[in-house]
């Protein structure tokens, strides 16, 4: 034996509710020169998209300047290290030489050469933990000379150099 459900009728809308609906619809239309804001896509969302589309390659440049050393790392979207160089790996051994401004140029030039050899043309983002524009400019210039272009610069407040990347010894140079 079936149990019959009671039939319920939808309540009619009150006049004030109808007015609210109409006013909301009219506010949606904007002036002709209005541009909608682009949605910010978080790094995690980008990661998911990268895993779905492995052919779409984007690379990030991480820069970290310590008191006695300079680190430059290029990673892919997933976080695997493609190129990693420091003053020590460029055979600059003494502390005095590591502190000099020329070390940054030599390290960035060597990173750029390796990146071009691996067929990297664009770096999507450039992360650095300080807001020192001089350092950023020197890196940008040395990368431009070799034909590498950085599309966007970002200052990261978190000081860890290993931010957003997983280091794998097999991938490192």
Curated annotation (Swiss-Prot):
Keywords: Mitochondrion, Ribonucleoprotein, Ribosomal protein. GO terms for cellular component: mitochondrion; ribonucleoprotein complex; ribosome. One of its GO terms (molecular function) is structural constituent of ribosome. It holds the Pfam family Ribosomal_S11. GO terms for biological process: translation. It comes from the Eukaryota. The keyword Chloroplast does not apply. It is found in: Mitochondrion. Belongs to the universal ribosomal protein uS11 family. This is Small ribosomal subunit protein uS11m. It comes from Acanthamoeba castellanii (Amoeba). The lineage of its organism: Eukaryota, Amoebozoa, Discosea, Longamoebia, Centramoebida.
